[in-house]
Amino acid sequence: MGQKVHPIGFRLGVIKTWDSKWFEHKNYAQWLHEDIRIREFVKKSLNHAGVSKVEIERAANKVKVNVHTARPGIVIGKRGAGIETVKKDLQQFTKNEVFLNIVEVRKAETDAQLVAENIATQLERRIAFRRAMKKALQTAMKFGAKGIRVACSGRLGGAEMARYEWYREGRVPLHTLRADIDYGFAEAKTTYGKIGCKVWVCKGEVLPGKGGQAPMPSNR
């Protein structure tokens, strides 16, 4: 069932960690809704900056928001003016003090979320879906990905009947828990309706044990 389950959720606590790092008994629902609103706002207001993910950490009366972006200069702005504006806007979603941290995504070409959003943008510009998908595969492999799988579903090319098409290059082992699989999803809003774009990127294996080698199985 590795092909059905969410690749990041499947690896939580093994090689992946949570995007929201906090624990709460009483105000769980309130904090959860705050996190959702913060993420939606950051994605919407910084959609031109290539936001990959938003991590939220909470401690005492402080909220630390880590924004992973491919274009940190656009977010920061002149002399940090952009950060202050976003920080001020985020303060309306929570009573606690907000700290904003910008993290640069070094290789946007191998970031699954950014690749999915790039394909969706191309589909909205009426670029042929096969061309957009194959270009994403070639670029990711060129920038060091071990494997990549891209899938699009919906009324592809304006067809009468919706269908599902996918392409893969390299290896994408979804069942292997030590495999570092990045996953991203985006929707293209076309005149024919929505088209879903899913991307899986394999960045190699996270091997446990000393010297970066996996423990050898016993011969029992």
UniProtKB/Swiss-Prot annotation:
KH type-2 domain boundaries: 38-106
CC annotations in GO: cytosolic small ribosomal subunit
Keywords: Ribonucleoprotein, Ribosomal protein, RNA-binding, rRNA-binding
BP-aspect Gene Ontology terms: translation
GO molecular function, one term: structural constituent of ribosome
PANTHER family cross-referenced by the UniProt entry: 30S/40S RIBOSOMAL PROTEIN S3 (PTHR11760), SMALL RIBOSOMAL SUBUNIT PROTEIN US3C (PTHR11760:SF19)
Stated family: Belongs to the universal ribosomal protein uS3 family.
Subunit-level organization: Part of the 30S ribosomal subunit. Forms a tight complex with proteins S10 and S14.
Protein's job: Binds the lower part of the 30S subunit head. Binds mRNA in the 70S ribosome, positioning it for translation.
Protein name: Small ribosomal subunit protein uS3
Species of the source: Myxococcus xanthus (strain DK1622)
Taxonomic lineage: Bacteria, Pseudomonadati, Myxococcota, Myxococcia, Myxococcales
Gene symbol of the encoding locus: rpsC
